[in-house]
A protein has these predicted regions:
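Extreme N-terminal leader/targeting segments of oxidoreductases
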Residues: 1-33
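Beta1/beta-strand and adjacent pyrophosphate-binding region of the FAD-binding site
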Residues: 28-43, 59-61
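Short beta-strand segments that buttress and anchor functional surface loops
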Residues: 179-183
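Core beta-strand elements of the Rossmann-like FAD/NAD(P) dinucleotide-binding domain
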Residues: 31, 185-193
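A conserved short coil-to-beta-strand element within the FAD-binding core of flavoproteins
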Residues: 162-177
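Residues in the short beta-alpha loop(s) of Rossmann-like NAD(P)-binding domains
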Residues: 64
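Aromatic pocket-lining residues of Rossmann-like dinucleotide-binding sites
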Residues: 50-51
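Conserved N-terminal/central alpha/beta ligand/cofactor-binding core
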Residues: 69, 75-160, 164-165
């Protein structure tokens, strides 16, 4: 019998529960109505991905910039440049953790986490995250991984708008009627039913 390698922690294999994304094309939203996902952190990315793969063409709005623009703004700031309030370590594609160390703080005991980890691997994360007790993508890989997930959302019919803030939600009779979007840099507003 083999003993575990020194310093290596391995997660026991738990069979994943089936995760079926229904094809909802037949039940698509009416007319020009859209499902709006606010934010492109991990929750927003995966919400948009599953909605897009179900055929619902989500509109994803992110108050910050795309990951490449964020990276350029962060490098400029670190070199003594001004803080870009729309493109920085806090806001933008991938969320606040995109430029952290790339460790995934996940509920690894959840049987659904496997689906998330597999999506990360399909998007370019190292395959080892599928069995590591403490999955780690790495700061060097995470920006490309989130870009690849964005491309999957778009290729499945979703739309992504960066530098766009969810400014207001218009309600009528207890139901959402529209959202008000605001350009993060100019303040220009648009109402989306």
């Amino acid at each position: 019998e083999l003993s575990p390698a020194r310093g290596v922690s391995v997660r026991p294999r738990v069979p994943p529960e089936p995760l079926t994304i229904p094809d909802l094309h037949a039940q698509a939203v009416r007319g020009d109505e859209r499902i709006v996902v606010a934010g492109m952190g991990p929750a927003g990315l995966f919400c948009a991905l599953y909605l897009a793969e179900a055929g619902l063409r989500p509109l994803v709005v992110e108050r910050g910039a795309a990951v490449d623009e964020r990276l350029a703004a962060i490098e400029s700031f670190n070199a003594g440049g001004a803080l870009d309030t729309a493109a920085n370590v806090q806001f933008g594609e991938g969320g606040a953790g995109t430029f952290s160390d790339g460790k995934l703080t996940t509920g690894t005991k959840s049987t659904h986490i496997r689906h998330v980890l597999e999506a990360f691997v399909q998007a370019g994360a190292p395959a080892e995250i599928l069995w590591q007790a403490k999955p780690h993508i790495g700061t060097d890989k995470l920006p490309d991984v989130v870009k690849n997930i964005r491309e999957r959302i778009i290729s499945a019919g979703g739309e992504v708008r960066f530098l766009t803030r969810l400014a207001d939600v218009e309600m009528a009779s207890g139901q959402v009627r529209a959202v008000v979007l605001e350009d993060s840099r100019t303040g220009a507003r648009e109402t989306v039913p």
